[in-house]
């Protein structure tokens, strides 16, 4: 790889783009002896597995002993065997069942094939069988699966919620009575709104297990010490900062019940990492300060060069449209070079492809026939594609966890591999180009979810009552708000309160299926349909708040490679009509926001400044969209503004906030020029802090919002708010409240290191700002943060 990197540095387009180069050394594998059933030994040997890695053996031993397990090792480290071995052992010994849950059907398809092959290797008489139960099967296929009674069932949280738990007593009693193992794959994916929903689903699952006394066979055998209704939980995770705490939060199990296995003992070769920062535009090219050349174009150059050089390469990018476009462009460039065979074997991979097409590309990567792929993060999940020579990251994927997962696809045995991260121009990308140590040496991000979100809890309590009557002790599943929620639902007529010999019980007394009245992926039920005005076909569905932001009259809406203009928004019928256009501009809404502090829940004095108190609170955020701005697509400069009349929205959520001491405010105002200097300083500090949330937590910058004001009625002084962008909050700002000094310090470092003069997309400008990034004072924001934390 050293020679290849030198060759890249000699290419005509090279202009000093390599900002950092590191080599992660390889290692030899370490193994452990595990006593296995002879049938399982034979099946594993037929699959090429002669011994278990030490980390696999540790996990197997822990599950055998009745512990819950978190296995947090990198991509391609063999996590699946850690749960497959005990699952198959229990099926062989006792006909016990295992429930495997993954967030994506593509991963389930891959696991079903792998586990089914291993089960067949055990022989027909073993009684071990594998089946998936997802939305991909029709009614007859699902009936056949239930009649067959597989010992290992693979499903998604959505199907567990909609199709299994509501029928646990009528259709699935045979499964839950023998359930000993629950496997949660990709547990790090259960964060934010989705993670909060799924955490409640798993608490409902635990209630059902208790009703069926799941795990009883294991407890009566020589293995395990579980309590009644308590199957073993095996959680597989990417490398995150809080694997045990997150697994406990998601599953509802005690953190002390989990055994952590996080040392990868599989063999790897050396991985060469390049941080590739595209050059800035020349001053005469019509772009603002700090603007850099496209990461897509830079990635394509590397992709074409490396594929032509014989390296099997995958480029990860964020959107389906980019993957499709640049796969086509890359193949065209290869043909222009005379590389016709390689060009024929370059493809795009994304979730919208059919299962068959995705499988063809996966098999081609595994066999080596496919030479290059442009992919969304769909290939980031644990689908088996073998090892690659090169992985390119077209822009920082948003979290270090995702970057290492994607980069972990590189590596063929112990051969050297290359990972190049090509930076975009936004804050996170440029921060990491300037602070590579933070990427390689800091603790991984934490996964955050909130299973006590009071906006979600009532729907899940209704669903739980529909699945199995409630009792007063169920607050151990649903937390402190449970009694109040039950009282409210009883008063509303959704629950029927009964006194029995065993105590109080609440039965579901509502209409229909509460499970089907909610989605696990969203909060709130009002949606707006976007349709093509030419034919009435639906283009997309947005939540009400998102529709006001993205589908207002005059908005440019981008969907699957096509631009549309919103020509009408009918909020009486919740329908927006769109027409295809080819504009040279994009749009961004303008809005006014106010925040009301409803209740302060926690407070702390800033450790670096004893006159600053940081608080965590319940707040109400009211937003009024007032208009929108048009921006030139090439230069990013504003070219026109229009007013809008849309309804106000209210978000009840959680926030951290802090005030600026009067002395510091006076110093900032004195150092500035004009009345907008201080408002610009606190506004820029707010933007910068929000932009760096994903460095500490697994989230997107749009998951949080902010407000800075020179005088707030609750505090009567200058105040900066940062709030969760979802009703009830998902735990992000609560966790940030606990580490706010680190967040401020990182933001200060970003502002100081950015070479721009007055603010740019790499430091304080935000693509989501409702005030058109005005005013912003980057230098004064740095002075403000320095006064707070230094």
Task: Please provide the spans of the model-predicted regions.
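Conserved SF2 helicase motif VI
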Residues: 398-419
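Conserved interdomain linker/interface between the two RecA-like ATPase lobes of SF2 helicase motors
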Residues: 232, 240-251, 255-319, 461
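Extended Lys/Arg-rich polyanion-binding regions
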Residues: 417-419, 425-442, 450, 460-472, ...
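Post-DEXD/H (motif II) to motif III coupling segment of the RecA-like Helicase ATP-binding lobe
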Residues: 188-219, 223-264
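SF2 helicase catalytic motif II
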Residues: 158-161, 165-212
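Helicase-associated low-complexity/disordered flanking segments
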Residues: 1-57, 67-68
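Conserved strand-helix element at the start of the C-terminal RecA-like helicase core
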Residues: 98-111, 303-333
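Conserved SF1/SF2 helicase motif Ia
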Residues: 88-111, 126, 209-214, 227-229
